[in-house]
Design a protein with these regions (language model features):
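Secretory/organelle targeting and membrane-embedding segments
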Residues: 1-173, 177-513
């Protein structure tokens, strides 16, 4: 593999006209638990470097890794550099690397080793003294939730959560935020004992994507959309997150979690809340959270969960030109596992704006393509003067917000087919970020890490949102536990037949992304 292009010039500060990330972090340190995991290696370390490469991290920024590895400082530097070189999106720059490297530290130890935390406390104090981090430190817990209590206890025992004066101490938590409502509350109790809620940042990386943030801009900055954004005109809303891959090497994490807990509880319900919420009074974290919480608290489950939910497991077979294994044949998966790799549910939002409008949410692995989108499907015209036979089969306008890949918007509408007779077919008008703007969109983790370091929280779910999401999902999960094995579906398709039947009973069908 060719090494990336390396430059040696010290990078200049960001372009003053770059208004996408207009803030620079204060002097601070970031302590990573789980620094050797895939997420840190492929996403988090490159995101930190790319922020530094764009001049968005203070020169005093420091990065401390905490792991069991018996690494020397040089070993850790080599690991961080290799991760950055393999996954940076802004190109490797020796000047940026040298600045970042001078703030790297590594503490070897296990999560339950008190002596390791004392060494960590000494390292943090040394960084304050020689690096100038100013007593400002964030602790990134990229670890399974089962380890949170022991890590939190040791952070408290060593005083690492304590701050003085205007210093700050924060904690950044990766999903899942619990396994159900009860465990989510227990997890919150553990964290809240040592950190204030305002200092807790729960990462949902989908909320850092440019298109997700554009939902609010599109709705509230354009007079043409908001008047139509209601039950009078909207037939239904479909929110899809599909992957075309299997679980890979994540069997230990995925089995027992499943598609609903992994994706619907956080990503899809957050997307639904942003789509359905009312305009906030002010564009502040608390005002946005309040409006999202109102949506989640207004969600109503369907009466017949057997008819209006669906779950499945991908089977083995051919996908594209490759023969792939089924979920039960994957390494580390029990032969009798009932964990779903596909989940679809129908929900209602009982507000004046959305009364009677179904929200269909679906997610799965080994589906037809990798795509995440929100499709707002409008009602058919009440009357057309040239007869229904002239219309295409669907004859419904739709506004599709593409979250990934190819971020942008698509508007589907009817247009006359050239010729003498009146025939109307569906056509699309497309907006793509990559074509409309010359700037690259920041990677989601860049935005979220910077937000956490500067203390801005509009894109981080509050504990109240987490609990509201589990209140929605728990009854569905409890019902599924009584239903035995999930329905198998062929790889490369769009899920089990029960998911298609769910919409067919309503006289609708899933949009093909």
């Amino acid at each position: 593999m060719e090494r990336p292009l390396v430059t040696t010039a010290i990078p200049t500060l960001r372009d003053p006209q770059d208004r996408r990330l207009p803030r620079i972090s204060p002097p601070c340190g970031l302590v990573f638990f789980g620094i050797t995991g895939d997420l840190a290696r492929k996403k988090l370390l490159p995101a930190i470097y790319d922020l530094a490469n764009r001049g968005l991290l203070h020169p005093a920024f420091s990065l401390t890794g905490f792991a069991r590895r018996d690494w020397s400082p040089q070993d850790f530097e080599e690991y961080v550099r290799a991760s950055i070189e393999a996954h940076t999106r802004t190109g490797f720059n020796e000047g940026t690397w040298n600045q970042l490297r001078s703030g790297l530290r590594f503490v070897s130890g296990t999560f339950d080793d008190p002596e390791a935390y004392r060494r960590l406390a000494d390292t943090v104090a040394e960084l304050d003294r020689v690096r100038g981090t100013g007593g400002n430190h964030a602790f990134y817990l990229s670890i399974p939730p089962s380890y949170f209590p022991v890590v939190a206890k040791h952070l408290s025992d060593t005083g690492l959560n304590k701050r003085q004066g205007r210093e700050w101490r924060r904690v950044i938590i990766e999903k899942p935020f619990g396994h159900d409502l009860e465990s989510a509350r227990e997890l919150s109790d553990v964290i809240s004992q040592i950190f204030d809620e305002q200092d807790v940042f729960r990462i949902d990386h989908y909320l850092g994507k440019e298109t997700v943030q554009n939902i609010m801009a599109m709705r509230f900055a354009n007079a043409m959309f908001e008047p139509l954004w209601k039950a009078n005109y909207v037939d239904s809303v479909q929110i899809t997150m599909a992957e075309d891959i299997g679980i890979g090497t994540r069997a230990g994490y995925y089995d027992g979690i499943g598609a609903a807990r992994d994706i619907i509880q956080n990503h899809l319900l957050q997307l639904m809340a942003l789509t359905a919420m009312e305009e906030p009074v002010h564009f502040t974290p608390e005002e946005i959270r309040v409006e999202k919480e109102k949506v989640l608290s207004a969600v109503r489950l369907p009466e017949d969960l057997a008819a209006d939910t669906a779950r499945g497991q991908y089977a083995g077979g051919w996908q594209g030109g490759d023969q792939v294994r089924g979920y039960l044949e994957e390494d580390g998966i029990p032969a009798d596992s009932t964990t779903e790799t596909f989940a679809a549910i129908k929900l209602f939002v009982d507000t004046r704006r959305w009364a009677g409008v179904p929200f269909y949410l679906r997610t799965g692995k080994r589906l037809g393509k990798r795509v995440t989108e929100i499709a707002v499907i409008f009602k058919r015209s009440a009357h057309v003067p040239f007869g229904n036979s002239a219309l295409s089969e669907s004859a419904q306008n739709a506004l599709v917000i593409r979250v990934q890949p190819d971020e942008g918007l698509t508007l589907k509408l009817g247009a006359k087919v050239p010729g003498t007779s009146m025939q109307v077919r569906d056509v699309t008008m497309d907006f793509a970020y990559g074509h409309a703007f010359t700037e690259d969109s920041p990677e989601a983790y860049e935005r979220l890490i910077l937000d956490a370091l500067v203390g801005s929280a509009p894109l981080f779910p509050h504990q109240r949102e987490v609990e509201a999401s589990w209140k929605i999902l728990d009854p569905i999960l409890s019902f599924w536990e009584t239903q035995g094995q999930p329905e198998p579906y062929a790889p490369g398709t769009w899920g089990p037949q029960s998911a298609h039947d769910m919409l067919a009973r309503d006289g609708r069908f899933w949009r093909l992304p």
